[in-house]
């Protein structure tokens, strides 16, 4: 399962899957023992029928995550697999759903984070590792400033459309341990290590 060691707190929790699509993350969360998953997507009729009929899944189709102020349950973890939008837009919204030490596992998709110039160079495929580094620095620095701590960063085992390299990050909200300088130093170490191991 893609979450690996990041999945320890999923069991018996209420979770949100932003950009649920056919339900890849939703299915993983249920297999790990999630009590309830809110499957949020702007599309309609995409979620797999098995998940659509699972009583643990709350189907929220035709729903833009940016318009959700809160959920009726205390949310322990949010997964994000969103396209055509930057995490820098979604994180402030997601932050409003969370309590202290809630978690976020999000895909960072360089093709949707890069500026038009960088995205246009490869017809939507980001191959330049310097661009990857710049995007990771921008997105994760933004997360730090939004009071998230960075607990993990890896290359996603699955590539995006057209072979785009994507990254999985593990964030916790408002842990408040360590100075901001220490957190930025740790961020830089994590980014460099991840990029060294790109496949």
Predicted features by range, described:
Residues 22-33:
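Conserved SAM-binding loop of SAM-dependent methyltransferases across substrates and taxa
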Residues 88-105:
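A short glycine-rich, Lys/Arg-flanked "PGG" loop and its adjoining helix->strand segment in the class I
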Residues 13-21:
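Conserved class I S-adenosyl-L-methionine
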Residues 110-127:
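Short, glycine-/aromatic-enriched active-site segment of Class I SAM-dependent methyltransferases
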Residues 1-11:
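Single conserved hydrophobic/aromatic residue that forms the stacking wall/gate
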Residues 35-89:
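S-adenosyl-L-methionine
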Residues 132-146:
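Short alpha-helix
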Residues 165, 169-199:
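Flexible, glycine-/basic-rich loop-and-beta segments that form/coincide
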């Amino acid at each position: 399962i893609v979450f690996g060691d990041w999945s320890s707190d999923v069991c018996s929790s209420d979770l949100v899957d932003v950009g649920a699509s056919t339900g890849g993350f939703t299915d993983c969360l249920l297999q790990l023992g999630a009590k309830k998953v809110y499957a949020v997507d702007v599309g309609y009729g995409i979620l797999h029928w098995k998940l659509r009929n699972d009583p643990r899944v709350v189907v929220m189709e035709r729903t833009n995550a940016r318009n959700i102020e809160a959920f009726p349950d205390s949310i322990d973890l949010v997964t994000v697999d969103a396209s055509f939008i930057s995490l820098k837009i979604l994180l402030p919204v997601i932050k409003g759903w969370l309590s202290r030490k809630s978690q976020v596992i999000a895909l960072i998709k360089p093709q949707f984070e890069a500026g038009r110039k960088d995205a246009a160079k490869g017809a939507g495929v980001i191959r330049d590792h310097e661009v990857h580094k710049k995007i990771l620095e921008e997105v994760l620095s933004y997360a730090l400033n939004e009071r998230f701590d960075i607990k993990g960063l890896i290359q996603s085992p699955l590539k995006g459309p057209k072979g785009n390299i994507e990254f999985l990050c593990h964030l916790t909200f408002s842990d408040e341990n360590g100075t901001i300088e220490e957190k930025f130093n740790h961020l830089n170490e994590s980014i460099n290590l991840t990029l060294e191991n790109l496949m």
